[in-house]
Amino acid sequence: MNETYTPPTILLVEEDDEVRPLLSQNLRNQGYHVVVALNEADAIERTKGGSFCPDLILLNQVGRSIQEYAVMGQRICKSAGIGNQTPIIVMAEQYGADMEGKDVQVDDTEYVTYLEDGQQLMNLLHRLCPVYSELSEI
């Protein structure tokens, strides 16, 4: 294979200073290129003018509704000129035991994950945005 492999890029929007470095490192350890944004304005600034096109947008819900975060993901896509095909995942902040461990597909490209553990998130990411080692196994 003569082509240079470029890992998928995840735009991580994470406001929590304690969670941000751990989550971004875990994503890198899984083979992803990670661009970290602190909030929506930072994400828009980083993607403005098509400076880069993430393969997936990952938002950690903090303090606002899941719907507000989904709309935030849509605004980031629109401002970056990213098509509607880019998956958006919102990691839910608070939820009941009945939702724990579930991944809910809201529409064609939007998902809400109610995490039971970190492996659940990685499984969803690998399904929506596989890394090279997974592609070579297909």
What role is predicted for each listed range?
Residues 17-36:
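Two-component/phosphorelay signaling modules centered on CheY-like receiver
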Residues 14, 59, 90-92:
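Short beta-strand/turn micro-motifs composed of small residues
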Residues 36-56:
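Acidic, metal-coordinating helix/loop segments flanking the phosphotransfer/catalytic sites
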Residues 40, 54, 58-84, 99:
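Conserved phosphotransfer microenvironments
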